[in-house]
Amino acid sequence: MSTATYDLVLSGVIYDGTGAKPFEGYVGVTGETITYVGKEKITGKENIAAPAISAGFIDIHTHSDLSMALDGRCESKLFQGVTTDVSGNCAFGPVPINRERMAEHTAHLQGMDFTGGGYQESDISWSDLDGYRATLEKRGIAQNNAP
């Protein structure tokens, strides 16, 4: 048994994403970094038994680019195991956006409630990719985003 100290240890069937067969094992996390994956039993400050453990999934065609910018918790994606969104691959995306397109966005998103107070035109402060990225950085998001 390893004598290393981990902040978090997950135990369960590991699907490592390499195409190898899944195996019973342990994942050790120190801080925000995975520092151990293997079959040797390890323990940590917090130990969680999980039915299955895998790398985060990538959603390669998503429409959450606006919701991500307005509510960075990304809960619906994270609960599904999606840790990275590839966005902006449709004609209806938040970048580039200008005042002429704002009415189109407002009409499309009117029924959505990202912030608890309803969708407002003033929620969008950017017009280009750099501004969108700066907004994500400033507001903070719980997922990776590849626009």
Predicted regions and their residues:
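N-terminal metal-binding scaffold of metallo-dependent hydrolase/deaminase domains
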Residues: M1-T43
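Generic low-polarity alpha-helical segments
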Residues: I14, V27-V29, N47, I53, ...
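Divalent-metal coordination cores built from histidine and acidic residues
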Residues: L70-P147
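A generic fold-level signal
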Residues: K21-P22, A52, G140
